[in-house]
């Protein structure tokens, strides 16, 4: 990398970091951190442990923003100093170090830009992702299991705790439905753009004639609501059924009815949890899913009213295809909203979907 190229990169990075400083309002950020630390130092702070944990989480999030900004700014200043020294006197080892630092700084800035883009009210929350294959039989159900693998690998690679809440086996292969919980900060923010219909085109391994098939699978994503958002669910409105449950692939089938299915009678929403070992645990998880769905339903209604006033007729529905995965006659994964695409389809199916997530966050600004 030539010094002139490094200089141009650092000038661009400097503009971005200055922009971060303006948007963050560092003085206000420091004041907010100080106020939270003062609250945490009070003798009665731990009297309400749930409230205390929220304060700690908020403090950690603000400190992370502040510390990450300072780290980028310090790295930029160090790189600029090294560039000045190299312009005065060549040093091969120092230039290699500067190239590595410039690359690392660019990566830090890109990550920080994404953090700033996660600014929606529920982006910081855990996420529940559901996969529902379409009407393509075994081929569609197998496609659902491929997407499950893709998302679980992505979550594990990014340090999220990944938990299967409910899993229903397919008739021959794959799955009929699955609910996956992603635990970690910003899980919902990263995954919310995955909501929609995912289309697969391939030569079906289940077709003896080796014909090309097109399958569709719907993905839904909801924030897992915390205690700061109250959703009232009347006991009289909920019908509970219990049944024997087993793990993915039909393993460890329980001899007692630990699986729980909840039906919200007024809306017809049905949720179920099967993976906990106890009926009580499954009921709690199913109720949390139901509350998230009811809250999402209310938010969708409000958004529909806004869209109607604006004359915006677009909506998330079964017909809203967001991404195509073509295995034959060529290999290509393309997002129909952002235009982002890649031919590295095997990497995508192994969970490397950051390019699509990042493109959606920028497109949705």
Curated annotation (Swiss-Prot):
GO terms for molecular function: translation release factor activity, codon specific. Disulfide bonds: none annotated. Methylated by PrmC. Methylation increases the termination efficiency of RF2. It is found in: Cytoplasm. Keywords: Cytoplasm, Methylation, Protein biosynthesis. The keyword Protein biosynthesis applies. It comes from the Bacteria. InterPro entries: PCRF, Pep_chain_release_fac_I, Pep_chain_release_fac_I_sf, PrfB. The modification N5-methylglutamine is found at residue 251. It holds the Pfam family PCRF. One of its GO terms (cellular component) is cytoplasm. The keyword Magnesium does not apply. Its main location: cytoplasm. Peptide chain release factor 2 directs the termination of translation in response to the peptide chain termination codons UGA and UAA. Belongs to the prokaryotic/mitochondrial release factor family. This is Peptide chain release factor 2.
């Amino acid at each position: 990398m030539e010094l002139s190229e490094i200089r141009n990169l650092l000038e661009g990075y400097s503009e971005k970091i200055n922009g971060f400083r303006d948007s963050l309002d560092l003085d206000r950020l420091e004041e907010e951190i100080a106020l939270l630390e003062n609250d945490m130092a009070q003798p009665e702070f731990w009297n309400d442990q749930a409230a205390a944990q929220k304060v700690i989480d908020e403090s950690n999030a603000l400190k992370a923003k502040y510390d990450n900004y300072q780290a980028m700014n310090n790295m930029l200043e160090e790189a600029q100093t090294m560039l000045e020294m190299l312009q005065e006197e060549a040093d091969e080892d120092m230039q290699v170090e500067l190239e590595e630092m410039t690359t690392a700084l660019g990566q830090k800035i890109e990550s920080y830009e994404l953090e700033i883009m996660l600014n929606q009210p529920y982006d910081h929350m855990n996420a529940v992702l559901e996969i529902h294959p379409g009407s393509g039989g075994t081929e569609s159900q197998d496609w659902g299991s491929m997407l499950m693998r893709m998302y679980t690998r992505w979550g594990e690679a990014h340090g999220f705790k990944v938990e299967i809440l409910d899993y229903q086996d397919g008739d021959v292969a794959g799955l009929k439905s699955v609910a996956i919980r992603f635990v970690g900060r910003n899980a919902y923010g990263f995954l919310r753009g995955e909501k929609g219909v995912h289309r697969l085109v391939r030569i079906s391994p289940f077709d003896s004639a080796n014909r090309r098939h097109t399958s569709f699978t719907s993905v839904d994503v909801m924030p897992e609501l915390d205690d700061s958002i109250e959703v009232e669910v009347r006991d009289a409105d909920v019908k509970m059924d219990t049944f024997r449950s087993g793990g993915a692939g039909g393993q460890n089938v329980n001899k007692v009815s630990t699986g729980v299915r909840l039906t919200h009678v007024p809306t017809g929403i049905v949720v179920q949890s099967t993976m906990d070992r106890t009926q009580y645990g499954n009921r709690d998880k199913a109720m949390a899913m139901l509350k998230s769905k009811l809250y999402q339903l209310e938010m969708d209604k409000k958004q529909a009213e806004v869209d109607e006033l604006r004359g915006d007729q677009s909506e998330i529905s079964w017909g809203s295809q967001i991404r195509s995965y073509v295995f034959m006659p060529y290999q290509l994964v393309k997002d129909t909203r952002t235009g982002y695409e890649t031919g590295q389809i095997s990497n995508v199916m192994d969970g490397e979907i950051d390019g699509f997530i990042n493109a959606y966050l920028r497109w949705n600004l």
